Amino acid sequence: MSVVDMSLWEPRTELGRMVKEGKIRTIDEVFANNYIIKEPEIVDILVPGLKQELLNVNIVQRQTHAGERSLFQAVVAVGNEDGYVGVGIGKARQVRQAIEKAVREAKLNLIPVRRGCGSWKCSCDEPHSVPFVVKGKSGSVEVTLIPAPKGVGLVAGDVAKAVLRLAGVKDVWTHTRGDTRTTLNFALAVYNALRNTYYFKI
């Protein structure tokens, strides 16, 4: 992933300035204080080793005053495989630009994921699955993540597997409803389910 040259980076937000000045040193501090990430450089600095995966690229039509124009749409997931994940979408006239935009948005959408050992069939107490049954929805797609015992793996479609793997979830059962062939909605439904592990009120 990107390496930020601190001497060249000029933060545009208060959070960015605190990160550059060393007042915020971890991504955990960002979420503990409810800061909103508006600069991808913040993620590059605070989450070293962030990985990315291209989930889908297709052509979409955009209506302009001159008629329809074709654009490439990219869907990308990023994560550190240890409790943080993001999903982004980018549109551009060139594939590379669309991917770059999607990566940038995915970083801005980074969220913490609460992991655990929520299956009654397992008592290892390690953060290999989700801590409880959780749901996420996007468009017509609804995804339910169900805690699974260690060794089960990711029982899910390829798109869901990619997002879950980047989040650091290793064992989970999934149940899906809706048109999962729509990569964007499928990825966002999984992302929203993972988001709910952190923001769910017990």
UniProtKB/Swiss-Prot annotation:
GO terms for molecular function: rRNA binding; structural constituent of ribosome. InterPro entries: Ribosomal_Su5_D2-typ_SF (IPR020568), Ribosomal_uS5 (IPR000851), Ribosomal_uS5_arc (IPR047866), Ribosomal_uS5_C (IPR005324), Ribosomal_uS5_euk/arc (IPR005711), Ribosomal_uS5_N (IPR013810), Ribosomal_uS5_N_CS (IPR018192), Ribsml_uS5_D2-typ_fold_subgr (IPR014721). Pfam families: Ribosomal_S5, Ribosomal_S5_C. Keywords: Ribonucleoprotein, Ribosomal protein, RNA-binding, rRNA-binding. With S4 and S12 plays an important role in translational accuracy. One of its GO terms (biological process) is translation. It comes from Pyrobaculum arsenaticum (strain DSM 13514 / JCM 11321 / PZ6). One of its GO terms (cellular component) is cytosolic small ribosomal subunit. Part of the 30S ribosomal subunit. Contacts protein S4. This is Small ribosomal subunit protein uS5. PROSITE patterns: RIBOSOMAL_S5, S5_DSRBD. The keyword Transmembrane does not apply. Belongs to the universal ribosomal protein uS5 family. The keyword Ubl conjugation does not apply. Residues 50-113 form the S5 DRBM domain. It comes from the Archaea. The N-terminal domain interacts with the head of the 30S subunit; the C-terminal domain interacts with the body and contacts protein S4. The interaction surface between S4 and S5 is involved in control of translational fidelity.
